[in-house]
């Protein structure tokens, strides 16, 4: 039994998935969006809603949550169907349509599928400390939901990548004490962020703890009191008073059922034709970070472009007898779906 009938099933409700709703709507195609998370926004909302983004056209700075809100508002005229908290498990191909079945038994009939699942299902990489679970979601967090939660607190950031560096810069504005623990003296972040960190280190806004790694967490009832860190060169140990610990060691990606769909995968990404975003399977497309091709640049902006290309190609599947006459949105306006 079919529960929903639509033109396109979009797998993933992150920024690229939401923008796909808008792009398909501009071509008079309807979408049903499936996501394993219980809210719209993907990693942008789940992991870093207040993280500033600087490379969205026309926005000198915008938070991840604001970007999602704007994309949702932009796509509202096309009345998408969101199936949240569900995972697309199976795809069945028929002559004139596809069936997508979720882990909840929901069945959606569509004419094409666009996979916009980012890195797939994801989870944070935990610190290798025995009792870390006791503190998680109480005083150990893998994302920042509200910067104000850390106002006038003693905070430790662990990690040396972009997320650790970016949040160190932002949280230095509100914390009472900020430690940055890393195994190396160099950080893997953008040159601009690196310059900001150097300035904050010199001004004492951030206490740099290198080359150290976290050895032990001390506290009770989920409340962190102290963190013991160990120098990886000299074995010297330091005990630092900390209210909150933010480990940023990346996330582990899991493509889940996608691996069983007969789609060509390379390095946990879906191989596509860069001109159309088609996969090797008929009527199945992939856009955003989950897709790959020679010269691929992993940017939200790139995903937006891929979404537009995929939707324009799918138009010929949905409307095989109607030629697509390209029009700019200024002259076309918002069509009714």
Swiss-Prot record:
Gene3D superfamilies: FAD/NAD(P)-binding domain (3.50.50.60)
UniProt-listed Pfam families: Pyr_redox_2 (PF07992)
EC number(s) stated in the UniProt entry for this protein: 1.18.1.2
Enzyme class, first EC level, given as a word: oxidoreductase
Cofactor requirements of the protein: FAD
Catalyzed reaction equations: 2 reduced [2Fe-2S]-[ferredoxin] + NADP(+) + H(+) = 2 oxidized [2Fe-2S]-[ferredoxin] + NADPH
Amino-acid positions noted as binding FAD in the UniProt annotation, renumbered to this chain: 35, 43, 48, 88, 122, 289, 330
Any GO MF annotation of the entry: flavin adenine dinucleotide binding
Similarity field: Belongs to the ferredoxin--NADP reductase type 2 family.
Name the UniProt record assigns to this protein: Ferredoxin--NADP reductase
Organism: Ehrlichia ruminantium (strain Gardel)
